[in-house]
Amino acid sequence: MARGELMKKLLASYGRDEDFRAVAEQIIDEEEKKNNRVLARTLRKTLEAGPQRTQSAPKALAPLIPFPEAAADFVERIEPEHNRNDIVLSAANVRVLLGLVKEFRRADEIRQHGLKVRSKMLFCGPPGCGKTLCAEIFAAELGLPLFRVKLDRLISSYLGETATNIRKTFEFARKQPCVLFFDEFDALARTRDDSGEHNELRRVVNSLLLFIDNMQPKGFLIAATNLDRSLDAAIWRRFDEVLWFDRPEAAMIGRFLKLKFKNVPVAFDPARNSAALEGYSFAEIERVCTQAIKAMIIERRKQVQERDFNRALQDEARRRAGQARLAPMI
């Protein structure tokens, strides 16, 4: 994006913490891509050292209706344990999510103009890249309870029962303001073109399409998948937004490393190792950081040394190599 446009967006967002920070992060990322690393580092330090957004008390959650027995077997309440400071997202995803939050807060006005409010999202990407964490934080930002669908209970071996269970779940979301979260969505929405699938699973997909079409939630429907290519082709247009959670690039890795070590004394700059971690998921990078911190604790030192980090990285690389050998067998 042209620098002039970014500066205009930055000034326009002044006073709105989320927007201001998102644009500032875009500017810093642009400088890093242009190899202006000293300037980027200075800007990031300035941003982090600025007045901290107050860690506001959790937003008041939407009132809970009495939990219906019909849905109790298929959904579980997830209590939020994280906030927006605990996640690193791409600038594109931040922009979409902020737009959805604003729409939700002005939903009545939008509907008065005869327009539809976006309420159905599909999260795609490899494991460990933040899909579930994003759903949790998104629900907390809206002040809505998060309910995760228990697929092991939802999917039944009895003819027609899975579709009945799906209907009960969607009826619950229609009455209860919430974020309804389907993880591993491909288990339900697998393509009907797969010759190995039997007629019952095809009927399940047909029912699912119908329920999503007719759903008018008081909150949001979020579905997440690691296997987007396995989804039925008709599923995609049922969602108002599709967000991609890819493995992070160097700039995002640097931010994530600083986040993971922010409360731990370190004897090196973790962000210097960003390039070595390209291609890793956030979950893998977090495991490297955790193991490095554990090494400091075990050896009773006051700081994490770079050698701790490097050893943890070597262990993770070994683990990845083993998984790569197994990949053709999975």
UniProtKB/Swiss-Prot annotation:
Which positions are annotated as binding ATP? G125, P126, P127, G128, C129, G130, K131, T132
**SUPFAM superfamilies in UniProt:** P-loop containing nucleoside triphosphate hydrolases (SSF52540)
Q: Which UniProt keywords apply?
A: ATP-binding, Nucleotide-binding, Plasmid
Q: Which GO terms describe its molecular function?
A: ATP binding; ATP hydrolysis activity
- Please provide an example of a Pfam family that matches this protein in its UniProt record: AAA
Q: Which domain of life is it from?
A: Bacteria
- InterPro entries attached to this UniProt entry: AAA+_ATPase (IPR003593), AAA_ATPase_domain (IPR050168), ATPase_AAA_core (IPR003959), P-loop_NTPase (IPR027417)
Q: What family does this belong to? A: Belongs to the AAA ATPase family.
- Put simply, this protein is called Uncharacterized AAA family ATPase y4kL
